[in-house]
Every structure is written in C-alpha cells, then in structure tokens.
Amino acid sequence: GVSDALGTRLIWCSEFEPPSEKTPNPTQGAARILAHRFPDVPNLGDMRAINWGSQAEVEVTAVGYPCFTADSLVLTIEGYRPISTLEVGTLVLTHLGRWRPINKVMRRMTGETVLVSAQGSPKIHATPEHPFLIESGEWADAKTLGGQRIVQILPEQGSPIDGSDAYWWMVGRYLADGYCQDRKGRENAGRVTFCIGKHKLQPVLDQVEMAGFHAYVSEERTAYKLAFTRNDFYRNMKIFGRGASEKDIPGHIVASLSTDQAESLLSGYLAGDGCYKPKNGWEAGTTSKALAYSLALVAQKARRVVCSVLVRNPPA
C-alpha cells in the first residue's frame, strides 16, 4: 500500500511469527502472504536480530502498529467490549477521558506479548512496545511497566441523567438479581423480574415504593419474585443486558451518573450480590467480566476507591 501511494520500491520486509500451535513454522501466516505477494523481496525475519549495517539504505520505513490480543476489553460508550468486536465509528474512551469514534481497525497476527495487570482494570495482553499512560503523565512501553502506576481514566462528566436515587438503587438490584422477558406479539414490551431472598424482601419493597413503582409479588420455594410490567422500565433495563452473563453498564451512563446516583446503583447491587467482610470490606460476584469492571468504575466514582477484580473458578 505504501509503495503504491508513494511510487517507491520495496527493498526488504521484516515479518516474524514465533512457532505456535497455529503457526509451527515462522514462514507461515503473514510471512507466507508477503512471500506470495512479493516473491523477490527478502524477508529479514525477527527485527531484533537484523544486522542493520549489512542492509541497503532506505528512504522510507513503514511499520505496523502495536496490538492487543483479540479478547482485550475496551471501554466503549455502550460498555466494555472485546477489542475484536469493535468497528469503525464505535465510540471509545480516550486518554483524555473523552468519547471519540474509531477511524480504522486492524487485525493481524503477532508473536510475543506481555501481560499488563493493574488494580481495577482489565488485564491486557499487549505487544511489548505498546504505550501506556503512567502516573507521571508520560507514555511508557508495556515491557517497561514493572512497578509503574498506570493511570485509569474515568470518562468526563456527561449530561445529567434522569432518575431518583431510589430508581438507580433498583437498577443496581436489577444488575444483581433481575432479568427481562419479552411479551409475545408486542414490540418493545415486556416484563422485568427480580428474584429476592426471603429475608431481603422488605428493603427491596421500600425502594420500589420510593421509586414510584409497583411490583407483583409471588412466593416461590426459596425466594420471592417481584414482577414489573411497566414497558418503560422493561426498555430501560434491557440496556443493561437481559441475563446474568450479558449484564453491563453502558459507558455513557457511567459518565453521566452523579456521585449520589453512582452510590445508589452500587448499593443496590451490593444489597443483592454483595457480602461485607470486616477484614476486606465489600465483595461482590458476577459471571459477567464486563459488568465487574464497569462496577469498579462506578465504585471509583461513588466512593473514591479502586477495586480489586479477581477471577475465581468454582470447584470441580
């Protein structure tokens, strides 16, 4: 592409893929494609091993961009999403805390990656040269981050969002214990159901009343079910995901919540899935990775704390 645009001639290329199950031979994958397209151009392999003094001088060097692995989570205006699912136009959070559209996406195979792990943020597998913003305000390569403090950016405060504190408490409770069901034959209509432990019913009913809602209560063997038939509530809750594994909080909502609203949402969630331990403080669980990190942002806004997010596999 660069050669065509500038009218230049390709002298050499450097493409290397360390052996793996998918590419046991370093000449496969992207290197094989280059060999097919440019059969007369030598591939110098691993750039770190090139003897630059023996190579012909060039006027223009074109390089690829550092990458993340496909499952890396990125905060979009709709919530955390795997980077492999993002498209041109998707609004993502920048290092300045602003939502900006993606102008171009790139997919390529890469070899070596390093793991970047920071409290309260998704773990990231990145190429060693990928830049990260650190506490000093400078950018540092991923491979040099040992012991550094990475800056976690919260979105700029958005436009004020509607809803009383009691309403946002119910949103938190929905994220913990709720699900949506469609009404057959009726578009954008449905029912929201909360499953509440029998010893937790009255505090939930108090919040429902304060929010101006009505719930139909039915008793099951181990819990109560609260059914809400208001279609506007159903449509609003669908935004947060229908079932446990799909739950998330859109980024624009995290940005627009006031401190009090964020506290109410967090309190509602903890009332359902939380557990207070005198030694460690509050803990909560979810099967949704995206929701876990979104709640960490809400907690940071509500209580000025940085959460630890841990993965725990159930015993076999």
Regions found by a protein language model. Give the residues of each.
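Surface-exposed loop/turn positions
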Residues: 72, 87-90, 130, 149
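Catalytic palm active-site di-aspartate
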Residues: 15-18, 89, 268, 281-282
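Conserved active-site and SAM-binding loop architecture
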Residues: 1-67
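A short beta-strand micro-motif
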Residues: 72-77, 92, 114-118
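NTP-handling and nucleic-acid-processing catalytic cores
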Residues: 83, 88-89, 102-104, 113
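Short coil-to-beta-strand transition motifs
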Residues: 93-101
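Intein-associated homing endonuclease modules of the LAGLIDADG/DOD-type, together
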Residues: 95, 105-315
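Protein maturation boundaries and topogenic segments
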Residues: 67-88
